[in-house]
Amino acid sequence: MEWSLPVDLQEEILSRVPAKSLARWKSTPKQWKGPISIEFLHLLRSTLKFPLLNLHLKSKSIYVTSFTAMVFCYAPPSTKDSRFGIHVQGKPSGLNLDTGTVSPTFRLSNKVVVCCKWRSDSINTIYFVGENKHVQVDQRRGDLTLGQSCSFLMNYVPSFVQIQQGTLLAPRT
């Protein structure tokens, strides 16, 4: 799709369109549709009603205390004096013995699902599903154990957002 509008106007338009609708556009750029074709997402696709969108982290830590977002839709950044966002906190609720992953589940009032997939190449991906009832995090058993709490601070959850920079803490022991 070729845009002839200013970037700020493009972002404003896209921020008003639901993520579900954007993912269905045939003219959606490949960079937005790419995450849907990842093998991990194919496994989840049959059980989820909404398209998966992604955020990338470059650390194996489960703790994300704050981050700066690079956005495809408008997302106001936080400042030292003001944090605009959602704080999500919880404890792991189950252990998948087949894959060796701990899957903590969080409840969110704004109904957004986040799935963190920690891959062997040390690039961590948080998948935003959108308009659902919980946040699910998959983490390697060695890095997080049952009973430990996890915490996320999300500045904003626009239709499409990618983490550019983050403050990450090691899991508590």
Curated annotation (Swiss-Prot):
Alphabetized SUPFAM superfamilies for the sequence: F-box domain
Official protein name in the record: Probable F-box protein At1g27490
Organism in which the protein naturally occurs: Arabidopsis thaliana (Mouse-ear cress)
Span of domain F-box: 1-46
Domain of life of the native organism: Eukaryota
